[in-house]
Every structure is written in C-alpha cells, then in structure tokens.
C-alpha cells in the first residue's frame, strides 16, 4: 500500500497555521507540531516541566506508523521500566483510535500488525536492550548467553573483596612495595587496616565504570590533572577570573554595608570609627588588586596575592552591623585558603605523581581481575553488560550496520539523565542523522546515577549554534500549573539559574508560560507561600529535632495549614502532597500527622516498619522479657499503653534505690522494701502488682512456647492488638503487629530458635540503619501523600508542600581525600613528609595533608555540580504543583532580611553568594530580599511557636482514650456481646464439622498432605484454597553473603527443561543446552541448573538409557485427576496433579519424578515422597488398569545424581 509522505518545513507551517485558526479547545503549540512532524535530521526537544513531552513523543511515533514505518524499526529508550510500560499503553490506545478511523483495509491490517508488535518492539530501558545484544552476540566476545545479573550487593562485595585481597597481597610484596605502602598510608593514615584505601579503589573503579570505555579512561584521563597542573602557569584562566570576581563581589558587599546609616555613625569627636576606616581600606585594596592583577601579581604571584588578602581582611567571616552578622568574607576565605600555600604544594605535589601511577596500575589490575572472576562465574553487573554491548558494536562493523540499517529513528526520553555509556550506545545505533531526543536539562537530578547533564547541554549549544547538525525545538508552554505557580517559579529561577550554577541560563526561552486560558486565570489566595518557623534555633528545645529531617515544630506548622485547607477550603487530603529530599528519617511527620488525625500515605519504598510506634512498643516488650535488666526497654514497656505508668509513677519507683537496675527497683516497690516505700501509693502498688504478675507469666511462657505464640499472648493479655485498632491508621497498625508475629514465626522456621536470637537479628538490622519492608495494606483513598522529590518527577499534584527547605545540602563528597573529574581525572589530598622543613630536634616527624592543585580544581568543579543539581531539584519540586505551592523551613524573623540583602549581578544573585549558600531557603530568601522592589509572586510568612499549640492547630478526627484494663469498656456494646455469643455457638458447630467445612471440591497432593498428614505422607504441586486469604510478604532480611536461589523457581525450570528436551535414541549435551535456551525462566535460575547431571542421567544410568530406548512409549508432564474420600467426614473430593513422566509398557508402567531438593542421604527424600508417588501410582492404576507400577525418583539436588527406586 502507499503511505503518506513525510512533511517538509512548508507543510509543517501550514499545519501550524491551521491549528492556530482552529476552534479546538486544547490546541497544539507551534513547537509541539514542529517536534511531531520534523523529519530528516537529528532533533533535540528541550521540554520544560508540564509542556507535554510525552504527548509529543507518542504523537511522533504514531505519525511514523501512519507513514509506513513499522514499530520494530524504531528504537525507543526510556529511563525506567515503568515509563516504557506507560508509553506502550498510550501507543496502544492511539493505534486503536487510528484503527477505528482507518479507511482502507490495508492500513487497518498494517496498524493491527503494529499493535501486536508493540510488546516485542525495542521500547524499554537501555539496560534491557544491552542485555538483548549481549545475549545474541556475546559469543563474539566469548560471553555465554546464559549469564546472570549480579544485582545482590552482598554477592558483588564477596567477589570484589576476594579479588582485592589477593591483589593487595601481591602489591604489598611486589617490587614497588615501599611506594605502595606509602600510597596506602596516604589514604589510611595510622589505621592498621587498609579499609580506607580499599574504599578509594572501589570509588575509582565505580567512577570509571560510568564512562563509555573504563580502561581507556583510566589510561588516558585518570592522570591528566596531576600531569598538567604542576606549576603556576598551568592554573586555568577561569580559576583566576573566578577569584578576581569573588574579590570584587566582597568589596561591593562591604561597600553596601558601609553605606548603611547605622554603620556610618561617627565617634564622639566627629571622626569615622576605626572599623569604618578599616573596611574602607579593605574595599580599596580588593578593587585595586583585582583590577590590576596582571600588573601587580600575575599567575606566579597568586600566593602573594592570597597572603596580602589574608593580611588585610579579618580572620573571621562576619561583619556585625546593628547586631546582625553578615558573612561578607566567607567566600573569599574559602577561595584563598589553598592559594596561600601553592608554592609549598607545588614543591611536594610532584612526589604524589608516582603514587598516582601506582594507584592507576592497581585499579587497572583490579578491574581486569574482577572482570575475569565474573566471567568465570558467568555473572555480570549492568555496567559490564553495557560495555560488552558497546564493544560488540564497535568491533563488529557488520553487527553495527545491521542495527543502523534496522532503525528508522533512534529515540530517547529523559535525555538529560543519560550517562556517557548510554550516549555511546545511541551513537552506535544511529546513522548520524536520525536521532530524536527529548528532555529538560533543568530537570536533570540523577547525577548520583552518573547522569551527566552536559551531554544534553553540549547538544543544545551545538544545535543552537549550527542547525545543520540538528534541529533544536524548545517547548516552554506549561499545561499543568496555574499562573501563581508558574510566576513564582519563574521569579526564583530567573535570578538564580545560569550556566555557572544550574548549567543553563534561565532566560525567556526557558521561562514557563501558561499553555491555556484556564491557567492564566488569577487566584490571589493561591499565591505561593514560604512558611518559616520563627526561631533563633536556640528557641526550640526539640531534643528530637536532630533525629528527623524535619523537626516536630515544622511538622506542626504543615499540619496546621493542611487542616485549615481541609476545613476552610474543603480541599480533599488526596489533593495534597508533601515532598521531601530523603525517603528516610521522616518519622516526625508521620507521628505529628497521626497526632492530629491527618491521614498520610508514603510512597516510594519508605521503610519505617521497625520505627512504627506499635512495633517499637512490642520490640521493647520482647527485649524486656528476654532481659529485664535492659532499663531502656523496660521503662518503655511500663510507659506504653499496655501498662500506662506515668512519669510520677516511674519517678517514685526510681528513687527506691540509687544504683540498682530498674527491674530490681520495680521488685523493691512490689515488695515495698525500697528506700522510700512510703511513696508507693495504693494505686501505684496495684499497677506494679498487675505488671509483675503479667510480666512473670510472659517470661515463663516464653521458655516453652514459640515466638509466634508469645507475641499473640501479649496481644491478647493486654488487648494491644485491639488498642491499636482504635487509633488513626488502624489497618496499618494492626497489619504491622500481625506481620511481627508472622516474621517471628518465619524466623524460627529458618532454623534459628529463641527470643534472644530474634532480638539480636532485629537490633542488627537497626544498627546497620536498615529496616524491614513496610507491610502493604489497603491504603486510604483520601489521604495526604508523602514522597521524595526524585519520586515525584513526572507527576503532578494540586497542592504541594516542599518540606525542610532549611536542610543543608550534602557536601560529604567534597571532603573526601580523593575527588574525580570526568575530564581532568584524579585529585588527591597528599600527605607530605615535611620534617626537612624544620630542625629535627624541634619536630622529628612532620606530616602535612595538603590539597594538591588538581584536588582544588576538582573540588570546585564538584561543588558547582552539586549546587547545580540541588538547584534543578528545587525546580523539579516547585513545578509539581498545579494550584498552590508551599515551601516550609525555619529562620529568624528579626535577622533574615539583612543577612540576604545582596547586590545583583546581571539580574542574578552574585555567583560568590550562590556558591556559598547551602540550602533551598538561602536561595529563596536571598532572591526575595535582593529583588524586593520587583514583583516576585511569592510571600514569606513567619509562624511562631505560640501559634502551633494544639488549640491553634486543631484536630481532624479526635479519638477517645482506650483503657486496655477495662474489659467492660472494651466490650461495652450489648450488640457486641450478643454477636460474640452467636459467634461462639457458630464456632462450636465449625469445630464439629471442621473437616467437611474446610474440604474443597478439588485438592492437590500437597493439600491432601496438609490436612491429613497423620494419614498420608505426600508432597505435590500447587496449593488451591477455597477461602481467599490476604497474603502479605513478611520476608526477613537475608544476611548471607550470596544470593539464594528460589527452590520453587529452580524446580519449575528443571521440570520445563526435561519436558523440552527433544527425546531420541541418543540425547546429547547439545540437545540439553538447546532446550535450556527455550526454558521460560530468569537467567540466574537457568544458570543454576546443573545440566551435567542431566546429561549423566541419560548417558550413564540404566533408567535414562531405557527411557531413550522406549521413547515411543514415553509420556511427559501428564495431568491426572482422581476421586478420593475424606476419612473424617466421608466427603468426596478430587485430587489433581501433574506426573513428571512415565513409560506405558504392555504389562507394566515405569513412573519417574524429578526432584531438585538438597539432600545428603537419598533415603530422606525416598521417605518424604513415598506418599506422593503412591498417589501417582494409584492414579495410573485406575487409568490403565495395570497393577505393576515401578516407581523411581531422579534426585538432582545432591553432589551426584541419584536414581532411587521406591517400594
């Protein structure tokens, strides 16, 4: 059939005009139309937040299909598996719509084919695609197609550590042993182990793996900075310019301060103050030295300049005016600290080069040996697979040409988050002029995953400067947010983001613009709010504030506004989302919202199970039972709702003895033998008596019963399970408690017994700052959402609260003794031996850690990259809101304004200040104060602690107190009493006819075993229950060093393999290998199948050989059904299952079954499966009326294959 031709620029212009003049309610923008139809060259679409980039991508793909391009001729890379699934769903919907409107049968047929082809088309992550290439063409590198992915970090660490240890030993005894020891000590200091050095090696290795060719990067770039920056003349010009800029900025800021009336006050004699004159002199010197730098100093005089600056400016960072401190000199101090000692640094820096060459050799050797170990294991990391794929395409022109010819277009979503490995893959798949890239550098927030926004930026600039290389299309219309959100976002980033910090100039071409008239409507009440807790830090006595990312007081501030929105503006809770920077340590928010009755659901893998209040109470209860001398746990138990001791009660108990453990004090109080027994009131005595009796009962019970039974006894004795059911989020709380009992049960089933071991396991999890997975329950529909900013990317919410904007950015990487740069290589802190600089009798040994020049340059590059990423993170967070945006932090109302009053530079905050600021709040307040004469579209509101009382905050659904000791109160409803009576009667009937009630019509062998284990000893296949039960995954953490294989998955794969082997008179190893490739199982599962044993079975065993001889009588994977009678109730039921295989001969049947169970003694398995094989034999007898059945087990789980004949 003939398809429509692709459009030229004139055709596209016509469509743009028609769209503009149409009466569509939602019109496509000219830029969207251009992005959909442009053809014949590379296209980069810079799509701002909410601009419809997914819409554009789907429409472009659909247009390709309608013009005759098959779906399998498109390569479409997405950032996540989820994004790929959503893209496929949208495509299916659009194709179905096109099918309905298609006029020709040929087109309908073609579109139907594309609809079918979506699931097998190359639409997915780059990881998935590179695996596909290596599976198919890995043989060119000697890589087996049956490899598995090393996803378990423990397994990776075991292999890495073994390789490292062997290599470390070789270097310690090699020809450069003395230098190597010096290298190790440079990073490990006086530590006796080499752990710090090992971490540096792993850091370099991981960084190199993010490049498109790790070995080449290590050989050509790793030492580049160390070999280049060896003297003053090598210092980059931009570093000098940056220093001079900081000097001028400092002078300008100081001049602004001297102009303040408060500062210019004269002394009593009418002359300027000493400080005033001193600061005027500093201004004069900084301006003079910066303007005449080349004449006065030049690069060789940088050390002298740094010393001159040090001599004239104060040693501290701040200048105080009218009681307010201004950090005027902070940035300047930071910039000159390394320059002051450059002469000394250059003197010793050369010594470090040989050590770095040694480190280079070590990492290269480590990389190669680690790779060889993985090849031996046939298990690889994702980065290995990606590099194999690149190597395959680079070294095999025919394979590369195959893909380049195949793909009409190479498309990529979220291009700003590409790394260099992915970029190289896209280059190899493209023919040079058929790439389509969609992204937004302002939303590049995955640097921790080695994403490099400069890849996008380089394309952006190249296409902007030279359109022949590719077409740049900018989508800036936002179809998500109201004008209040767009205006505030623009007002912040117009003054904040440029190429220095943020990696792109936020000019008019990037400013967000409302895409529809509806969004342009003004809603003054929805103006963006910066809500700040008014505090001088010392005002808050939040002992918990360091424990959480957001303090309880800030959480109250948020709760108050949410309750106001809900009650006064009728905003549903589900329309509100809280965004945080981290997915951990948000307990303060959870607890505060619980307190005020605000429903809250967390998203994105929040793991706070062990930190939930109800679980913490139970863990402390178990700790106390295990060891009553654990004061912390015991006091927590007494204070908990289970026993309700208050502070006064605990104080009276505590003073019964000064030195004893608290449990002994409780016993003294119980027997009234303490130092102050007169303080034990009758009411308190009754409480203690009840506690002691209950507690001792629990301790006695724990000695002879399982953990599961103990936990449920605690729940029932103190009605604790019922108690949490009366609290907010009752379903979640009860599910957590239920999960604790099941997890304890699973723990004991693993072979570990006892309360002490269980507690140690839990404590180990907590010590490692880990947690157990949260229990999933049916989440409330109308609840506030809590998620990380990263998780929110691509989503939209009506009301957004960005929390904890006063939290400092993490700069931990900048303090590392080793900093890496993709372009300049390594920079280190070098520990120099400077004892020759001083007289030996004064200091016999002097070692100084100095920041080498490459380190200083890399440090500044890393700092700017970190600040740029944080700025983009703030942009992502602010652009999630549809209606209203809140930003929440804390600051001092009396001090903040002057602190952030800066001098604008090119309509931006000064670069020096932007580099100094380390919180979102710093940026927001500085913009607000510096540009206060402009309309900024966001307000700053301070809230005092006095406004955050319970009375001011309010409550959503206040709950009544629950008394666990009052059984009448807990069962107060007559209806409940009657219901319980009826249920008890029903339960009696249920117990009487339990067997018949629980018996389903159809059973499998394993279910028969479950109910009638005393009668039969069998084990079979799948379990079918008649009553559907909610099943929750209560997995305990795996502390083993290697990933365990799922026995069920392995068993299923072996059975499928045995079914797929093409049977003949002579089964060969090639037949088994071929069948294995067809098995539908994970690569790791297939790799675990020991096909050598299967080959041995066919080649060496009598049964295996006989099966091959009688292949025409062979039946495999044969289903059966058989009627049985329940011996207890007389009810009839059907047993159903699948027999692995049997030979149907003239007068007998040979029945065999494969087992992958681990075993030492085969007789154990013979006994275990006696019942199952008997059932299978009975079914075959009834089916064929043949009495003689020979039964065999083929055991694959031992060191050697065993064939066991059953009785």
From Swiss-Prot:
Family annotation (SUPFAM superfamilies): P-loop containing nucleoside triphosphate hydrolases, Restriction endonuclease-like
Catalytic activity: Couples ATP hydrolysis with the unwinding of duplex DNA by translocating in the 3'-5' direction; ATP + H2O = ADP + phosphate + H(+)
Domain of life: Bacteria
One cellular component term from this protein's GO annotations in UniProt: cytosol
GO molecular-function terms, A-Z: 3'-5' DNA helicase activity; 3'-5' exonuclease activity; ATP binding; ATP hydrolysis activity; double-stranded DNA binding
UvrD-like helicase ATP-binding domain span: 26-482
Keyword list, A-Z: ATP-binding, DNA damage, DNA repair, DNA-binding, Exonuclease, Helicase, Hydrolase, Isomerase, Nuclease, Nucleotide-binding
Boundaries of every UvrD-like helicase C-terminal domain copy: 508-794
The keyword Electron transport belongs to this UniProt entry's keyword annotation: no
BP GO annotations: double-strand break repair via homologous recombination
EC number: 3.1.-.-, 5.6.2.4
Binding site for ATP: 47-54
Cofactor(s) this protein cannot do without: Mg(2+)
Family recorded in the similarity comment: Belongs to the helicase family. AddA subfamily.
Record note on quaternary structure: Heterodimer of AddA and AddB/RexB.
Free-text function comment from the UniProt entry: The heterodimer acts as both an ATP-dependent DNA helicase and an ATP-dependent, dual-direction single-stranded exonuclease. Recognizes the chi site generating a DNA molecule suitable for the initiation of homologous recombination. The AddA nuclease domain is required for chi fragment generation; this subunit has the helicase and 3' -> 5' nuclease activities.
Protein name, per record: ATP-dependent helicase/nuclease subunit A
Annotated source species: Streptococcus agalactiae serotype V (strain ATCC BAA-611 / 2603 V/R)
């Amino acid at each position: 059939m003939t398809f429509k031709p692709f459009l030229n620029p004139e055709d596209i212009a016509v469509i743009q005009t028609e769209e503009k003049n149409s009466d569509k309610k939602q019109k496509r923008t000219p830029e969207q139309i251009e992005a959909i139809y442009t053809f014949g060259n590379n296209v980069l679409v810079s799509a701002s937040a909410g601009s419809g980039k997914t819409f554009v991508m789907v429409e472009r793909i659909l247009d390709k299909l309608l013009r005759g391009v098959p779906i399998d001729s498109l390569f479409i890379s997405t950032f996540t598996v989820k994004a790929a699934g959503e893209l496929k769903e949208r495509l299916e919907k659009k194709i179905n719509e096109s099918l309905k409107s298609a006029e020709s049968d040929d087109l309908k047929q073609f579109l139907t084919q594309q609809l079918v082809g979506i699931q097998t088309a190359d639409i997915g992550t780059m990881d998935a695609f590179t695996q596909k290439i290596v599976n198919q063409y890995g043989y060119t590198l000697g890589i087996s197609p049956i490899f598995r992915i090393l996803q378990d970090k423990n397994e990776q660490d075991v292999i890495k550590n073994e390789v490292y240890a062997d290599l470390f030993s070789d270097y310690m005894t090699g020809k450069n042993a003395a230098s190597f020891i010096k290298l190790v000590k440079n990073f490990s200091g006086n530590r006796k182990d080499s752990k710090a050095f090992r971490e540096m090696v792993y850091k370099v290795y991981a960084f190199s793996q993010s490049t498109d060719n790790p070995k080449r990067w290590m050989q050509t770039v790793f030492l580049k900075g160390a070999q280049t920056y060896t003297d003053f003349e090598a210092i980059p010009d931009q570093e000098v310019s940056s220093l001079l800029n900081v000097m001028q900025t400092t002078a300008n800021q100081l001049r602004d301060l001297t102009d303040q009336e408060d500062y210019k006050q004269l002394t009593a004699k009418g002359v300027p103050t000493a400080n005033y004159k001193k600061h005027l002199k500093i201004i004069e010197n900084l301006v003079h030295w910066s303007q005449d730098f080349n004449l006065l100093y030049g690069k060789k005089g940088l050390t002298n300049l740094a010393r001159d600056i040090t001599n004239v400016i104060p040693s501290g960072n701040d200048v105080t005016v009218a009681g307010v401190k201004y950090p005027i000199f902070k940035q300047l101090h930071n910039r000159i600290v390394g320059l002051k000692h450059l002469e000394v640094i250059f003197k010793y820096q050369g010594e470090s080069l040989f050590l770095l060459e040694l480190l280079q050799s070590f990492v290269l050797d480590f990389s190669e040996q680690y790779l060889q170990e993985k090849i031996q294991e046939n298990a690889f990391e994702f980065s290995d697979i990606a590099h194999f794929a690149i190597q395959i395409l680079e070294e095999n022109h025919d394979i590369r040409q195959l893909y380049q010819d195949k793909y009409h277009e190479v498309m990529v979503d979220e291009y700003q988050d590409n790394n260099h490995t992915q970029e190289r893959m896209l280059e190899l798949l493209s023919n040079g002029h058929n790439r389509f890239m969609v992204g937004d550098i302002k939303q590049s927030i995955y640097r921790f995953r080695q994403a490099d926004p400069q890849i996008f930026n380089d394309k952006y600039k190249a296409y902007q400067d030279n359109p022949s290389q590719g077409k740049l299309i900018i989508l800036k219309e936002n179809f998500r947010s109201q004008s209040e959100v767009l205006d505030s976002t623009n007002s912040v980033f117009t003054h904040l983001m440029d190429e220095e910090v943020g990696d792109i100039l936020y000019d008019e071409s990037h400013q967000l613009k409302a895409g529809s008239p509806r969004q342009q409507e003004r809603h003054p009440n929805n103006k963006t709010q910066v809500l700040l807790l008014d505090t001088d830090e010392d005002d808050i006595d939040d002992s918990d504030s360091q424990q959480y990312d957001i303090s309880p007081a800030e959480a109250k501030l948020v709760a108050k506004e949410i309750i106001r929105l809900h009650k006064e503006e009728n905003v549903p809770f589900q329309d509100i989302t809280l965004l945080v920077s981290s997915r951990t340590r948000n307990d303060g928010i959870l607890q505060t919202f619980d307190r005020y009755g605000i429903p809250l659901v967390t998203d994105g893998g929040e793991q706070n199970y062990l930190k939930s209040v109800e679980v913490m109470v139970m863990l402390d209860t178990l700790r106390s039972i295990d060891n009553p001398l654990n004061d912390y746990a015991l006091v927590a138990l007494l204070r908990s709702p289970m026993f309700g001791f208050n502070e006064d009660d605990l104080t009276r108990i505590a003073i019964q003895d000064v030195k004893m453990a608290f449990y002994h004090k409780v016993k003294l109080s119980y027997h009234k033998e303490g130092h102050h027994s007169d303080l034990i009131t009758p009411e308190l005595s009754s409480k203690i008596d009840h506690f002691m009796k209950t507690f001792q009962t629990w301790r006695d019970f724990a000695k002879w019963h399982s953990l599961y039974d103990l936990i449920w006894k605690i729940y029932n004795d103190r009605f604790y399970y019922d108690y949490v059911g009366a609290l907010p989020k009752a379903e979640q709380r009860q599910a957590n408690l239920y999960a604790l009992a099941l997890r304890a049960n699973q723990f004991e089933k693993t072979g570990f017994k006892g309360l002490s071991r269980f507690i140690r396991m839990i404590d180990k999890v907590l010590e490692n700052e880990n947690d157990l997975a949260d229990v999933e329950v049916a989440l409330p529909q109308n609840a506030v959402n809590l998620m990380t900013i990263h998780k929110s990317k691509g989503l939209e919410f009506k009301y957004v609260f960005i929390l904890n904007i006063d939290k400092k950015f993490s700069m931990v990487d900048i303090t590392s003794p080793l900093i890496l740069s993709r372009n300049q290589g390594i920079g280190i802190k070098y520990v120099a031996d400077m004892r020759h600089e001083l007289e030996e009798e004064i200091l016999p040994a002097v070692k100084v850690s100095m920041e080498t020049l490459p380190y200083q340059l890399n440090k500044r590059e890393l700092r700017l990259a970190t600040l740029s990423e944080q700025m983009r993170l703030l942009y992502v967070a602010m652009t999630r809101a549809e209606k209203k945006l809140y930003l929440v932090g804390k600051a001092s109302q009396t001090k903040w304004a002057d602190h952030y009053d800066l001098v604008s530079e090119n309509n931006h905050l000064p670069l020096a200040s932007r580099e100094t600021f380390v919180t979102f709040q710093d940026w927001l307040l500085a913009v607000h104060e510096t540009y206060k004469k402009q309309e900024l579209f966001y307000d700053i509101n301070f809230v005092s602690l006095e406004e955050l009382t319970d009375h001011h905050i309010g409550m959503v659904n206040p709950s009544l107190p629950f008394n666990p000791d009052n059984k009448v109160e807990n069962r107060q409803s007559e209806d409940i009493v009657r219901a319980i009576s009826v249920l008890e009667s029903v339960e009696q009937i249920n117990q009487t006819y339990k067997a018949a009630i629980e018996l389903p019509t159809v059973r499998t062998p394993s279910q028969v075993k479950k109910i009638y284990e005393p009668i039969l000893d069998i084990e079979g296949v799948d379990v079918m229950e008649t009553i559907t039960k909610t099943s929750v995954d209560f997995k305990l953490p795996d502390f083993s060093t290697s990933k365990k294989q799922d026995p069920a998955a392995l068993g299923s794969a072996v059975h499928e393999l045995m079914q797929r082997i093409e049977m003949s008179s002579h089964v060969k190893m090639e037949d088994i290998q071929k069948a294995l490739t067809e098995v539908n199982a994970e690569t790791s599962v297939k790799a675990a199948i020991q096909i050598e044993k299967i080959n041995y079975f066919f080649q060496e065993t009598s049964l295996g050989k006989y099966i091959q001889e009688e292949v025409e009588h062979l039946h495999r994977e044969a289903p059966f059904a058989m009627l049985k009678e329940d011996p207890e109730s007389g009810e009839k039921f059907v047993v159903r299952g699948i027999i692995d295989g049997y030979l149907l001969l003239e007068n007998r049947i040979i029945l065999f079954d494969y087992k992958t169970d681990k075993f030492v003694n085969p007789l154990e398995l013979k006994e275990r499966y006696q019942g199952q094989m008997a059932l299978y034999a009975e079914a075959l007898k009834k089916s064929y009326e043949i009495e003689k059945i020979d039964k065999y087990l083929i055991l694959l789980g031992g060191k050697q294959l065993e064939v066991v004949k059953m009785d």
